Amino acid sequence: MDNSSTGRYPAASLPPAYLRPGSSSFTDFLRAQAPELLPTARSFPEGSVVQAAHGTTIVALTFKGGVVIAGDRRATMGNVIAQRDMKKVFVTDDYSAVGIAGTAGIAIEIVRLFAVELRHYEKIEGVSLSLDGKANRLSGMVKGNLDAALAGLAVVPLFVGYDTDAADPDRAGRIVSYDVTGARFEETLGYQSVGSGSLFAKSALKKLYDPDADAEGAVRAAVEALYDAADDDSATGGPDLVRRIFPVVVTVTAEGAVHLPEERTSAIAETVVEGRRARPAG
């Protein structure tokens, strides 16, 4: 059987662009070869208003030996609940995770591209990006969405990671927040929240945060903060015991970034709800 390029099964070949040496950034490669595939490759007529689902509240806090990030599950479209079980927290590589607030569709595309960006860099360079490098790459992607943000489709991620180069492993958990222009801000207080319920969540974390807590205590504080946000912000969804919908939680430690099993998050959420029956104000 003839398997040559002139036979029945032509030999597969990659386009020259795939073999040309260049940047270790997958985003740069995509921008050069297929810019229409970028999440930010959209144009909006002047004065247009687009109705789209929005993710709401994300919280993050450090603990002794790592960092936890958690998000509620509600997505809204104006005054309507668009989705009750949306996932807004994603593991992006072995030592980082991202939570999203803002326009859900664009935000999810950006996070997926960010995860590919990190894997691509590691394959090309043979090493992982530093935590600062990861935060800067995400900053550039948020900045690229500025035109959409001005049209009302803003994306505001919350980035967390474990710094494998930190001098003190107990304080290696880090949190980075962004504004819609892509400016990045390192959080020094040990906790942060973004989204519509962030004001209430941060107020809760101000009282609940303990830098020496273990992972279990930090997860409990995160769920408590999301409960408080849902209590006062209609766009944030609290634990739904009827539909069995609970926050998505990721911990990042020296062992890596891990999604908490739903059985564990549901048990913690149920404990929080039970405690609020006795003390509604927390």
UniProtKB/Swiss-Prot annotation:
Activity regulation summary: The formation of the proteasomal ATPase ARC-20S proteasome complex, likely via the docking of the C-termini of ARC into the intersubunit pockets in the alpha-rings, may trigger opening of the gate for substrate entry. Interconversion between the open-gate and close-gate conformations leads to a dynamic regulation of the 20S proteasome proteolysis activity.
GO cellular component: cytoplasm; proteasome core complex, beta-subunit complex
Entry keyword set: Autocatalytic cleavage, Cytoplasm, Hydrolase, Protease, Proteasome, Threonine protease, Zymogen
Any single biological process term in GO: proteasomal protein catabolic process
EC number of this enzyme: 3.4.25.1
Molecular functions per Gene Ontology: threonine-type endopeptidase activity
Keyword hit for ATP-binding: no
Pfam families hit by this protein: Proteasome
Main subcellular localisation: cytoplasm
Catalytic activity: Cleavage of peptide bonds with very broad specificity
Source organism superkingdom: Bacteria
Biological role stated in the UniProt entry: Component of the proteasome core, a large protease complex with broad specificity involved in protein degradation.
HAMAP family tied to this protein: Proteasome_B_B
Entry protein name: Proteasome subunit beta
Upper taxonomic lineage: Bacteria, Bacillati, Actinomycetota, Actinomycetes, Pseudonocardiales
